[in-house]
Amino acid sequence: VVLIDGKGSFHQAEIVNITKSKCEYQITHSQEYPKTWNNNIHLAIAPTKNIDRIEWLTEKITEIGFDELSFLNCRFSERRVVKNERLERIIVSAAKQSRKSWMPQLNEMVSFKDFISMPHKGLKFIAHCYDQFPKTDLCSALNKEDIKEDVLILVGPEGDFSVDEVDLALKN
C-alpha cells in the first residue's frame, strides 16, 4: 500500500492486521519529495455561485502545487458558505490521482476585511477590473527565476471586488 502524508512524503506500507473497524499497517519505506516551489503560493478567492467551479478549482490547485487556499466573503460574493469537508476530500483525491506528495492547506471562509488585516509576507497581487488602480501583469511578475518570496493572489467574485476592497487591498 502507498500512503501520502500531504507534507512531502510517500510511504510504502504493508498491512499487518485487519479488523472490522480498523486496518493496521507497518511502514516499510519512506521517500521525501521537495516542493517544486521554494516558497508558498496562496490563492484567496471569493467562491462562485456554482459550487462545481470551486470544486474544479480546488482539484486543479492541488494538481498544480499551490500551498494554501482561502475563501473570501466579499461585498459582491454570491456564495457565503463553503463546506470545507467536501473540499478536503477533493484535495486528497486530487493529490492521490496526480501523485502529489504535498497538499494545500484549506482555510475557513473569512471576510475580505479580516483577511486583508492578517499579515501576509512576500509578493501580493489582486485581480480587478478598475482602471483607476495600478495593474501588474501577473505572468511577467512571476516569470522571474529569482523570486524567493511567498506569493498571495486575490481573486474576487463574479461581479469583481468593490472599489473599496481594491483600495483596501492595495493599501495593505
What function would you assign to each model-found segment?
Residues T48, G159-D160:
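Short, surface-exposed acidic/glycine-rich loop or hinge patches that mediate macromolecular interfaces
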